[in-house]
């Protein structure tokens, strides 16, 4: 098979090259400029996929990955550890620009990107899977999502959580039975949390023992238990009721920068009616209320809404899916929306198009669903696009788009 020069990176992180017949071929674990010999070619009508067989000529953009799991091609959590940081950032800028041009049909350049202060050791949450036979707890393989490998250390997660994981690994016999998943999380105050997700069954009675063993190893953490279909319960370690399952940014420092930029882009809010959609635990809602806005806040996770209410300040908070709550909201002057990776429901886009607020600030963690939603908002023009590097070593990127009502 002929050698292939990798031209650029695709949105999922795979390298893109060309076959002799002109078809595009996607090759994971390659960098722009690599000359590679592909293996396991699988052809389709318009494109092909292959594995990296041999690296014939490494690109100047290629670096040695830090993570042994990545080197062994085990882990699917990172896609770009083999690519130098500047080239990663350039690729993520391109992912956003390409999606907006190709999918949303918007005439925009690749946006500027605000770099992260840390390229590694930044995630304050990691979700671990359990193998079908219950013997392995770790992450999914990058090429086999149905397989789980035992995690030793994740290099994009904060060391405080990985040190906790080293202690937990040695205490596996004390984990609850019928385990389905484990979440490690560090709060802003520095406290560590472990959430054990299990199949339905009797209440976990071993939390106190595991907590004592962790303390003996200087690895204290609040332990939570959540049976399938049930609410999480704090079982040992702290009295606070703060739910370990509500959404928070996994890269808090960069998340704060995203929020600050989004609020600034919204403009003056004193005396204005503002919708905060997909509001999470209400940090944006609180900032808007403190600035004098009349805020309508919507969040589907009732635990997050309760946490937001406990933090204040006053706002009209609605617990429910945005598309179901719209009819209860008063027409907005301004809107900020921060949906999950799946983007906004079509009914939400249709309502925003009909109501036509003066300005809409869209915070997105997926360029493709962002572009889809912008395609449903033709009466708004793009005033600004800015990307934020919340997820170094991966193909993911956060984007803030400022939309203004076209006159």
Residue ranges of predicted features:
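Extended interfacial segments that mediate partner engagement and assembly in macromolecular machines
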Residues: 53-68, 72-179
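Terminal RNA-binding accessory module
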Residues: 1-72, 86, 144
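Rossmann-like S-adenosyl-L-methionine
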Residues: 5, 11, 174, 201-407
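Short, solvent-exposed loop/turn elements at beta->coil junctions and helix N-caps
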Residues: 112-119, 182-185, 229-230, 386-390
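A short glycine-rich, hydrophobically flanked beta-strand micro-motif that places a catalytic Asp/Glu
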Residues: 111, 177-186, 221-224
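A short, glycine/Asx- and small/polar-enriched loop/turn
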Residues: 120-124, 190, 395-396
């Amino acid at each position: 098979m002929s050698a292939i020069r990798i031209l650029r990176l695709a949105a999922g992180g795979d390298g893109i090259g060309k076959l002799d017949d002109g078809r595009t071929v996607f090759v994971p674990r390659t960098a722009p400029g690599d000359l590679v010999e592909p293996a396991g070619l699988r052809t389709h009508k318009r494109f092909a996929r292959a594995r990296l067989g041999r690296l014939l000529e490494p690109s100047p953009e290629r670096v040695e990955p830090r993570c042994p799991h990545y080197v062994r091609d085990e882990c699917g959590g990172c896609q770009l550890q083999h690519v130098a940081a500047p080239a990663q950032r350039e690729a993520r800028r391109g992912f956003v620009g390409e999606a907006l041009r190709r999918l949303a049909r918007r005439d925009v350049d690749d946006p500027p990107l605000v770099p992260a202060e840390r390229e590694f050791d930044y995630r304050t949450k990691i979700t671990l899977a359990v193998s079908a036979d219950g013997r392995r707890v770790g992450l999914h393989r990058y090429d086999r999502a149905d397989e789980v490998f035992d995690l030793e250390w994740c290099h994009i997660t904060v060391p405080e959580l990985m040190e906790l994981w080293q202690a937990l690994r040695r205490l596996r016999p004390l984990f609850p039975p019928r385990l389905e998943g484990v979440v490690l999380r560090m709060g802003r105050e520095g406290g560590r949390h472990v959430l054990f997700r299990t199949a339905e069954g009797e209440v976990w009675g071993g939390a106190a023992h595991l907590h004592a063993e962790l303390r003996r190893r200087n690895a204290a953490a609040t332990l939570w238990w959540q049976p399938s279909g049930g609410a999480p319960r704090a079982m040992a370690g702290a009295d606070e009721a703060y739910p370990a399952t509500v959404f928070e940014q996994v890269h808090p420092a960069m998340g704060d920068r995203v929020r600050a930029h989004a609020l600034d882009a919204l403009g003056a809010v004193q005396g204005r009616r503002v919708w905060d959609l997909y509001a999470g635990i209400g940090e944006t809602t609180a900032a808007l209320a403190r600035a004098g806005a009349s805020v309508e806040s919507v969040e589907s996770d009732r635990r997050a809404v309760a946490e937001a209410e406990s933090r204040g300040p006053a706002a009209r908070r609605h617990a429910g899916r945005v598309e179901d709550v719209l009819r209860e909201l008063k027409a907005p002057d301004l809107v900020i929306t921060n949906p999950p990776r799946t983007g906004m429901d079509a009914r939400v886009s249709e309502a925003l198009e009909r109501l036509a607020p003066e300005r809409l600030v869209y915070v997105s963690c997926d360029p493709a669903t962002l572009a889809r939603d912008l395609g449903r908002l033709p009466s708004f023009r793009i005033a600004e696009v800015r990307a934020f590097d919340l997820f170094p070593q991966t193909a993911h990127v956060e984007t803030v788009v400022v939309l203004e009502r076209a006159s």
